[in-house]
Amino acid sequence: MVRIESSQPRKQRKARYDAPSHMRSKFLNAPLSATLRETYEKKTIRVIKGDTVKVTRGDHVGEEGIVDGIDTRNVKIIVHGVSSTKVDGTEVPRPIDASKVEITKLKLDDKRRVEKLGGKE
């Protein structure tokens, strides 16, 4: 079967919206900081709960926090300390796209993740 690729934005959005869960996981990759990139010799890695990230785009640029949760359905991450204020004054977490953050510290509790990273010893 031949795969037809389109450059139309509506078809790109539809493809992301209709993507199966194993593909959505790939959309949750975030770039590593310069020091981590040097250490692990990788540019991007999947964000997991517990990683420390720094926001690089948007209204919350420069803010740093720990990932509190991951929404695979909407392909967004929830960062501790990044929130919006509702009209009634309550704070609600602000979901952020994984490509708009930079991983500054990795959570290395998972042995499989450490093996996959490899890197310099």
Swiss-Prot record:
Q: Could you tell me which InterPro entries the record lists for this protein?
A: KOW, Rib_uL2_dom2, Ribosomal_uL24_euk/arc, Ribosomal_uL24_KOW, Translation_prot_SH3-like_sf
Region of interest (Disordered), residue spans: 1-23
Which GO cellular component terms, listed alphabetically, does the Swiss-Prot or TrEMBL entry include? large ribosomal subunit
Q: What family does the database annotate?
A: Belongs to the universal ribosomal protein uL24 family.
Oligomeric and partner information:
Part of the 50S ribosomal subunit.
- Role, per record: One of two assembly initiator proteins, it binds directly to the 5'-end of the 23S rRNA, where it nucleates assembly of the 50S subunit. Located at the polypeptide exit tunnel on the outside of the subunit.
Xref: PANTHER family: 60S RIBOSOMAL PROTEIN L26 FAMILY MEMBER
* Record protein name field: Large ribosomal subunit protein uL24
Species per Swiss-Prot/TrEMBL record? Methanoregula boonei (strain DSM 21154 / JCM 14090 / 6A8)
